[in-house]
Design a protein with these regions (language model features):
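N-terminal Rossmann NAD(P)H-binding glycine-rich loop of SDR-like oxidoreductase domains
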Residues: 4-26, 31
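Conserved C-terminal active-site "lid" loop/helix of NAD(P)H-dependent oxidoreductases
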Residues: 280-312
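Mid/C-terminal beta-alpha module of Rossmann-like enzyme folds, strongest
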Residues: 227-286, 316-334
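Alpha-helical substrate-binding/gating segment
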Residues: 201-209, 214-242, 247
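Conserved Rossmann-fold NAD(P)-dependent oxidoreductase catalytic core, especially the SDR/UDP-sugar
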Residues: 91-154
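Active-site Tyr-X1-5-Lys
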Residues: 150-177
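NAD(P)H-binding glycine-rich loop region in Rossmannoid oxidoreductase-like domains
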Residues: 46-103
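Glycine/proline-rich active-site loop of Rossmann-fold NAD(P)-dependent oxidoreductases
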Residues: 172-175, 187-198, 230-241
């Protein structure tokens, strides 16, 4: 049985990556910052896999800010799926967040090298492949974000710098690296404690007074987890970046999906002037990342993942609907 290490097990994406690999017959060991969090994580994962598959999951305590416990726990694995990354809280400086993100990535990659594990699949972000907001381009994996772009927030800059650092380290140390670049990650949550990026959908589901014109390139978390496994298993993916979102819905279009499927919510769709989002983003952290996306016209292509790996995606309408159904089922929408 092959074994993979998944970093940041308590995260929204990492949880689904764990489920994906367990269901495919892998042994999975995942890092958590505190072993006190394993009870909750076990319950989340157990709800999505069989009892037999659950027996192949283990945990170890490790933090991206420290070298402690990484090497000995990675040793003997067939590969590392590096998902963990700091999101930031909107208050850090560029330097602070970039340093934490880069150092965390290099901590894991250096531990993999010392443990003799060459294969690494890393979660990056479309933030590392973003043009200026007025661009109308169709972008593929060859495009890298210009960190001098004034539209970029510290989080986006940190994703660019940490991915570049990963590629540099991989080239210098003969690691077999693949990076995955998702867009706005939505989909069913595994528990009411893991809302994560679905917080945006929760606001739309509960009705926003006005909706900014923000087109979102959507990555279904289930498809994203599947892409990590496909990339890990396919030697053709070594040395490549893969974009993981190409289908777009505006926030108003998401509201329309909810208006149709949940009429009792009495959702009203009102377009907001751009300046209202800019003001609201000062007080609501999850809205800050949306400001550079106002009225954007550029988009990405996922042809590489489709052609190389046979990857497919849910329709974005199904993604946001499935996410909402789970939010409602778990009572998070109240």
């Amino acid at each position: 049985m092959k074994k993979v290490i998944v970093t940041g097990g308590t995260g929204f994406v990492a949880g689904w990556v764990i489920v994906e690999f367990l269901k495919a017959g892998y042994e999975v060991s995942t890092s958590v910052r505190s072993m006190k969090k394993t009870d909750r994580l076990e319950k989340e994962i157990a709800g999505a896999v069989s009892k037999e598959e659950m027996g192949n999951l283990s945990f170890f305590e490790a933090d991206l800010t420290s070298d402690k416990n990484w090497v000995e726990n990675i040793k003997g694995a067939d590969g590392v799926i590096h998902v963990a990354s700091p999101m930031g809280n909107g208050t850090q400086s560029v330097e602070e967040l970039v340093t934490v993100a880069k150092n965390g990535t290099l901590t894991v990659l250096n531990a993999a090298k010392k443990a003799g594990v060459k294969r690494v699949v890393m979660t990056s972000s479309q933030a590392a492949s973003t043009p200026e907001s007025n661009s109308t381009e169709t972008l593929d994996e060859s495009f890298w974000t210009d960190i001098n772009n004034p539209d970029l927030d510290p989080y986006r800059i940190s994703k660019v710098e940490s991915e570049r650092a990963a590629w540099k380290f991989a080239e210098e140390n003969d690691l077999e690296l693949t990076t995955i670049l998702p867009g706005a990650i939505f989909g069913p949550i595994l528990s009411d404690k893991a809302v994560s990026s679905n917080g945006v959908l929760l606001r739309l589901l509960n009705g926003m007074p006005m909706t900014p014109h923000v087109p979102l390139e959507i990555s279904d978390v289930r498809d994203l987890a599947h892409l990590h496994r496909l990339a890990f298993e396919n030697p053709q993916a070594i040395g490549k970046r893969y974009l993981a979102a190409s289908q777009t819905l505006t926030m108003a279009e998401i509201e329309k999906v909810y208006q149709t499927n949940f009429p009792y919510k009495k959702i009203k769709i009102r377009q907001a002037p751009n300046w209202t989002l800019k003001i609201a983003a000062r007080f609501v952290p999850e809205l800050r990342a949306l400001v550079p996306m106002l009225d954007r016209k550029y988009h990405h292509t996922t042809v590489a993942a489709e052609n190389d790996l046979g990857w497919t995606q849910h329709k974005p309408e199904d993604t946001v609907l499935d996410a909402a159904k789970m939010l409602i089922k778990l009572g998070v929408d109240k």
